[in-house]
Amino acid sequence: MSQEFLARILEQKAHEVEQMKLEQIQPLRQTYRLAEFLKNHQDRLQVIAEVKKASPSLGDINLDVDIVQQAQTYEENGTVMISVLTDEVFFKGHLNYLREISSQVEIPTLNKDFIIDEKQIIRARNAGATVILLIVAALSEERLKKLYDYATELGLEVLVETHNLAELEVAHRLGAEIIGVNNRNLTTFEVDLQTSVDLAPYFEEGRYYISESAIFTGQDAERLAPYFNGILVGTALMQAENVAQRIKELQIDKG
């Protein structure tokens, strides 16, 4: 994903937001708070499992998947949250996937999308999300803060995604409680787990850190476990022949 490609996505999002109706705020779906769970379960590397049919880098991943069944398998095997892609154009997701999954599971759900506007936040909440994603690279620091504050005022938690030290510092200034480190370089679209390892020395007490992208094996998870509270895994689970077994391999006990 080059910056040009990220710009294309954001341009598409701006167009979608322009057409989007402002929904009335519905009651927040009740489940546990992700940050609280991470705080109280630091003896294991927690898995956030993603429902993702396709991506710009890989193309089609699993178009025929029964999304609800996949999500229920995630929940049954102890994942801490389910991430649901809702971007239609680039990831072949849909808001209805979030709605369907959120109505059939009890654990938190994350709306995985490129959020640039309050209307998207309301829409995510109404569809059952209890956590939203805000990407530092996609927003000015001022806009990021406005959207972060708006989401938290609505009772949502926010996963603030970073890719480098400058963005991590933005997340810290924001006061973000849950911070993601994406191992995908947005300029080259290459992935490298070393991104997460390199940023770990700058982590701060009292925050919870999630490593995202390029995590496929138990060995990958072992490498990240000393530094992170959790990992977000999509492709490896969407392609796994035995999803339950793959989740178990990724849930590293820290003792």
From Swiss-Prot:
GO biological process: L-tryptophan biosynthetic process
Keyword hit for Lyase: yes
Keywords annotated in UniProt: Amino-acid biosynthesis, Aromatic amino acid biosynthesis, Decarboxylase, Lyase, Tryptophan biosynthesis
Keyword Amino-acid biosynthesis belongs to the record: yes
Matching Pfam families: IGPS (PF00218)
SUPFAM superfamilies documented for this protein: Ribulose-phoshate binding barrel
Pathway listed: Amino-acid biosynthesis; L-tryptophan biosynthesis; L-tryptophan from chorismate: step 4/5
InterPro entries with a match to the protein in the record: Aldolase_TIM, Indole-3-glycerol_P_synth, Indole-3-glycerol_P_synth_dom, Indole-3-GlycerolPSynthase_CS, RibuloseP-bd_barrel
Reactions listed under catalytic activity: 1-(2-carboxyphenylamino)-1-deoxy-D-ribulose 5-phosphate + H(+) = (1S,2R)-1-C-(indol-3-yl)glycerol 3-phosphate + CO2 + H2O
Similarity remark: Belongs to the TrpC family.
PANTHER family (UniProt xref): INDOLE-3-GLYCEROL-PHOSPHATE SYNTHASE (PTHR22854:SF2), TRYPTOPHAN BIOSYNTHESIS PROTEIN (PTHR22854)
Listed NCBIfam families: PRK00278.1-3 (NF001371), PRK00278.2-4 (NF001377)
UniProt protein name: Indole-3-glycerol phosphate synthase
Gene: trpC
